[in-house]
Amino acid sequence: MKKYYFSTLLLVVFLLIPLTVFADEKDTKNGSHPYDMVNSKGEVIKYEDYMKELDTSSLKKDENYNGSGKILPERKLPNYKKYKPYKSLSPSVPSGAIQKSITPYVVIGEDGRRVVDDTSVSPFKQISYIELEWADSWGWCTGTLIGKDTVLTNGHCVVDPDTQQGITGAYVIPGLNNSHYSYGAYQVVDYFVPSQWINTGDSSQDFAVLKLAPYIGENAGDVAGYRPIRQVTNIANQTVKVYGYPSDRINDAGTYSQWGMSGTVGREDTSLAFYQLDTFNGQSGSAMLNSSNEIVGVHRGGYTFSDGQSFNGGPKMIKPVYDFIKAAQ
């Protein structure tokens, strides 16, 4: 994460405490921007500030890195399940500008998902299980490593715009398979979400970048590798794959493994892509991967259109999303 000047909204001692209401951000006359960046401490990094930094620096080319593959011992993780109830992380309703209804998940017709047998190969090695702790519950999402210590996921996985509260803790486990893992488990120490996600729950803003601490001296991306992000405009009729950790399949099997499938982007608008790939709660935050395994969007949930058709979908990697993610890295 590059250095920027912060507009501090509240002072806290520890990272990853619940966020509070950001009333000032709702007034665009005060100079706020939908892609202003808010971190886990409630500090705001203004859009114009990080864009100046991006404009004056040479952005590194997004490259695929498969990681060292170093085998690390499993670590003792907090047992959230023992003390707190499970929280189904359902996306909020969209903004008034998006006339679609949204559900947490959709299995469309016959379930076409398959289990991933080998998560030691890319891109499955970079797809990660994220276990989340809230003040009164726990849950999980999916994310994808995009740098040595950064993960891309959904905004609703870390901040609930209805309550304005954030997670109190989280761990990221790359390549979790049959409830075992080889590449370490990494504590989330910070996160970055768009201010408009906190203020409105806008579907097109439902993404987040997580920052990870090293585990026994190793960074997650150095060990498991990371996926490149690809800026896009139109991806209709392109093939994408969406893999993650769906709760229905995990509960049926009794073990945590990756599931997913490939298909075609059937509809899109300027900021969202829609496809009839089957997903379920727990796959929130999964990457939309193109045929080159580049990230072109972030899966969010199920959408039902006014014509009655059901799709899954989420934010595309349009320029402001791409810029936000690059700045957060």
Where are these regions (language model features)?
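Catalytic nucleophile loop of clan PA
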Residues: 278-299
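Sec-dependent N-terminal signal peptides of Gram-positive bacterial secreted proteins and lipoproteins
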Residues: 2-24
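Cytochrome P450 catalytic-core helices
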Residues: 149, 153
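Chymotrypsin/trypsin-fold serine protease catalytic domain
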Residues: 203-279, 309, 315-318
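Protease-domain processing segments flanking chymotrypsin-fold serine proteases, especially trypsin-like
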Residues: 24-142
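Active-site-proximal beta-strand/loop segments in catalytic clefts of secreted hydrolases
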Residues: 132-133, 154-157, 173-176, 211-214, ...
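C-terminal cap/linker of serine protease catalytic domains
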Residues: 296, 300-329
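Conserved catalytic-core segment of clan PA serine endopeptidases
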Residues: 102-125, 129-140, 159, 165-218
